[in-house]
């Protein structure tokens, strides 16, 4: 699992940052990529990476401001040009209006896609759930309807304790599979084995939370609780003047983001959606000003790739679920 930041700026493209789009690379987990927001020129940014548009199976749209959606029609069209077919559908999760926006752009431009396009209008709670991942959405507080997302990887089953089985002279074969599945197995010599005694502890799945355009609100902590990575908008830095601008425009400051990460007990905070003013010394200060609140903080740059590793120490009862 990796995060690739295709755009880390806010409002409009700048010389150093494109507008918002983040790829969650799940190539090992499900041979797929998920995008979170698709700002203008996202597909140009993708050309600078190893990402393949055909691998994108889901797009999550936080809200309908242009710097988060103007890249959608072009990306969808290019995905079609690059050979996506009826067996490679794409699902877009977003607020009311995203379907109308996309369909209008495709209709007016007479663009016909070669693959199925599915729309899911966001509601609070679980918006996607399968055997490997669950996605939870919650409303944010912005100038228009806006959403945050919590991506939960399902826990990984524990490993079969093969050395223990061999030490007890238990023959390999179908029995191993039954024990790994947690079943009780009767051996020819009369022994009865409980699979749970021969499987190591489950490995906790990873959690990544995306908080994009919003002012501070209680749902942020709910979505970010015990997250491995919290990706949080930081349109403005620390300071009273910045705080006033953030309140006026319904955005967050770097201090807001750090406080949210601390309260939620997240592992890492990544700041994104930066105003174009933050370059040079101001950019350095953006991080240094908040590390006393949340030390494990970094600022994303365009095309950064961040690994989200599995934890080595695991617990079946870890209360990280919302």
From Swiss-Prot:
Keywords: Endonuclease, Hydrolase, Metal-binding, Nuclease, tRNA processing, Zinc. It catalyses: Endonucleolytic cleavage of RNA, removing extra 3' nucleotides from tRNA precursor, generating 3' termini of tRNAs. A 3'-hydroxy group is left at the tRNA terminus and a 5'-phosphoryl group is left at the trailer molecule. GO terms for molecular function: 3'-tRNA processing endoribonuclease activity; zinc ion binding. Signal peptide: none annotated. The active site is at residue 67. Its EC number is 3.1.26.11. Pfam families: Lactamase_B (PF00753). It is an enzyme of class 3 (hydrolase). It comes from the Bacteria. Disulfide bonds: none annotated. Its cofactor is Zn(2+). Zn(2+) 2 binds at residues 67-68, 213, 273. Zn(2+) 1 binds at residues 63, 65, 142, 213. InterPro entries: Metallo-B-lactamas, RibonucZ/Hydroxyglut_hydro, RNase_Z/BN. Binds 2 Zn(2+) ions. HAMAP family: RNase_Z_BN. Belongs to the RNase Z family. Zinc phosphodiesterase, which displays some tRNA 3'-processing endonuclease activity. Probably involved in tRNA maturation, by removing a 3'-trailer from precursor tRNA. NCBIfam families: PRK00055.1-3, RNase_Z. Homodimer. This is Ribonuclease Z. It comes from Leuconostoc citreum (strain KM20).
């Amino acid at each position: 699992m990796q995060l690739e930041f295709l755009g880390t700026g806010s409002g409009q493209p700048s010389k150093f940052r494109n507008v918002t789009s983040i790829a969650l690379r799940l190539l090992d987990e499900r041979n797929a990529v998920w995008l979170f927001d698709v700002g203008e020129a996202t597909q140009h940014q993708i050309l600078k990476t190893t990402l393949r548009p055909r691998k994108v199976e889901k797009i999550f749209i936080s809200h309908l401001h242009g710097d988060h959606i103007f890249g959608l029609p072009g990306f969808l069209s290019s995905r079609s040009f690059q050979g996506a077919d009826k067996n490679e559908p794409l699902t877009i999760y977003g607020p009311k209006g995203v379907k109308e926006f996309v369909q209008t752009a495709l209709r007016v431009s007479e663009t016909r896609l070669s693959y199925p396009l599915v729309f899911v209008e966001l509601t609070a709670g679980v918006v996607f759930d399968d055997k490997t991942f669950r996605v939870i959405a919650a409303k944010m507080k912005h100038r228009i309807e806006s959403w945050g997302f919590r991506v939960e990887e399902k826990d990984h089953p524990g490993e079969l304790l093969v050395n223990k089985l061999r030490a007890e002279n238990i023959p390999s074969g179908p029995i191993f599979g039954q024990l790994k599945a947690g079943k009780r197995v009767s051996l020819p010599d009369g022994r009865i084995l409980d699979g749970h005694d021969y499987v190591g502890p489950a490995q906790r799945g990873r959690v990544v939370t995306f908080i994009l355009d919003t002012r501070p609100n209680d749902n942020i902590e709910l979505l970010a609780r015990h997250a491995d990575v919290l990706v949080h908008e930081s349109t403005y830095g620390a300071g009273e003047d910045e705080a006033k601008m953030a309140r006026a425009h319904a955005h967050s400051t770097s201090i807001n983001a750090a406080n949210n990460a601390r309260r939620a007990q997240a592992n890492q905070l990544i700041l994104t959606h930066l105003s174009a003013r933050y370059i040079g010394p101001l950019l350095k200060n953006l991080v240094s000003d908040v590390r006393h609140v949340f030390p494990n903080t970094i600022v994303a740059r365009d095309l950064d790739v961040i690994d989200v590793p599995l934890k080595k120490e695991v617990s079946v009862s870890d209360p990280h679920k919302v």
